[in-house]
Amino acid sequence: MTLDSQPCEDQIRALVRGLDKAAIKKDDYAYYPEGGGSHSFSFLRSTNCWANTAEAKSDHEGSEGATTFYQAYQMRGLAMWAARSGDKQALELAGKLARYVMKPRFWGNAADPPHVVGNEQGHVDSHFHARMAALRGLLEYGIVAGDTRACDFVRSSYEYIRSYGINRIGFTPYLYDRNSPAMESCMLGDFLALTVKMSRAGIGDYWDDADRIIRNQMAERQITDINLLERLSQNAPKTAVPESQPGQISTENVHERMLGIFASITMPTCSISGVTMQCCTGNAARGIAYAWDGIIDGQGDEVSVNLLLNRASKWLDVDSYLPYEGKVVIRNKTANRISVRIPVWVDRSKLQASVNGAGRKLSWVGAYVVFSDMKPGDKLQLDFPVVEETVRLSAKTGEKEHTTYTITFRGNTVVDISPRNESPDVYPMYLRDHMKTAKKAPMKKVRRFVSDKPVLQW
């Protein structure tokens, strides 16, 4: 959609008016009730509007047990539209929803120490995907409206959520029932959206978090091996699936059709469920796009490289040899000034840079090394040792139990992890022996498309 498309713009403004009419308004806030239906998103089930307009008493209400979830997408969509159109009604409604979502009764964790006021800092105790969807809506509104309180709330809540699990590999349990030790893949998209947007907005520097997620849990949760998938299917417990609609169940080429989807419920080293919810594929796949978009930021003749991942763009191309080699080649097209963010694990004293083979002195601005007076066609190369490190980190694997994992990293990339679940009824992850032994990055020739227009507006 473009804003010069009048029919689309008229329809969106009508949608905003409809959302405003449907919202329950009180004082300076507004909300959409759960509705009393049989599904989490029981919006406007009849022409008489809501069956039940009662205001929620906690965040654990509704079939998803997540009151703030039911405001999340409306809040984000309204704020995004306001940013693009200047629609004051949309921004005002987003603000009212934000004030409802941030009410202290929806936040907090009883396990917090007495002196920690967790319900004012976005602390949570359940359903992290639903909470982060609400945080995404709050963040969008906070950035568009310049609401520092909303942005600060999101930052605090994000940092609290990532303290669960093993943040360094991008694993965080989703706590659907407040005791679940597994992670839902929907959260991968949430995490990448929050890390990229907060970093760009200057709310914090979370690029290393994004790098760890995309290189590890995101890459490993995508189902790509049909043999492992068939093994899981043959050994997993058999359950009867009721057919609610004619033709709803299909048994044709199921494994082949599943390749590329994202596993729903996983532990740090494997997928543990023979069932996949397709919400996870939709949300996780968008996370890939968020990370891809975040690799490069360009404006005029100034470009920032935020993530050392492969990316072609109209400004420059990034060729990353990580994790095999400590080498990144940037082929300049139009930039005069290139800023490259260096990951936290790189030893800055051993970082070297050259332009067209000639050494360059390093000039730092925070975590970025800056190169000025670049010319079209210049080849900028960064070289540094790849640090291999083995650490022991723990994650909850039962209602009370924790498992300590021995994890070997090359930079931010996991190349080995143990103990593993060797059961044939799981889909194993981190089968990365090739990353442990290879000293040269594998190469292949591909054709890449570069758009001259913005690809994403999210």
Where are these regions (language model features)?
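Solvent-exposed loop and edge beta-strand segments that line ligand/cofactor-binding
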Residues: 1, 37-72, 106-140, 144-147, ...
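N-terminal catalytic cores of secreted or lumenal carbohydrate-active enzymes
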Residues: 1-62, 66, 77-78, 82-85, ...
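Well-ordered alpha-helical scaffold segments within catalytic/enzyme domains
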Residues: 1-7, 72-88, 133-147, 189-203, ...
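C-terminal beta-rich recognition modules with glycine/proline-rich loops and embedded aromatic residues
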Residues: 94, 154, 207-223, 227-235, ...
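Beta-strand-rich binding/interaction modules
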Residues: 335-355
